[in-house]
């Protein structure tokens, strides 16, 4: 007989691990680890290099266009560009960085060091620690927690500033005909002169 709902004990024992298409999976990370070993990054140093990549991207941006200079601290013969290139061969760089977003967040808070481009990115000083483009990983339950958890959760201002920055990054003035009237972009205004255009999907 088919059971459509569980009994009390089965329900109490039911477990679920959060997954998100915007965050790297363990299988994807293992694929990257294998590729990295092939260029001289030991498996034991995977986190060190992953964290260095995420930190560097948090100072700039994490995208297919990201080109990182310098070498891996724990594997000096390997360039960050090469390490990032192998990440991109498996999944988008930002998706990889989101996996480590909570570690980036904690480190920057504990060292009082906001992302380098926070002012250029038009973030208010009160939200400067949220000024990295994979910040949404801090609130994504599929991204792992640091051993001691978050130092603190993001404030409403930080969440709002990051969301605004995300929409601003999407908005482009182009003659593509893709127009948005989303309140996040127009702030409720309807002036024709304020129309914002989005890139084609």
Swiss-Prot record:
GO molecular function, one term: structural molecule activity
Cellular localization per UniProt: Virion
Superkingdom as given in the UniProt entry: Viruses
Keyword presence, Metal-binding: no
GO cellular component, one term: helical viral capsid
Keyword field: Capsid protein, Helical capsid protein, Ribonucleoprotein, Virion
Role played: Required for genome encapsidation. Forms ribonucleoprotein complexes along with TGB1 helicase and viral RNA.
UniProt record similarity statement: Belongs to the potexvirus capsid protein family.
Protein name: Coat protein
Native source species: Lily virus X
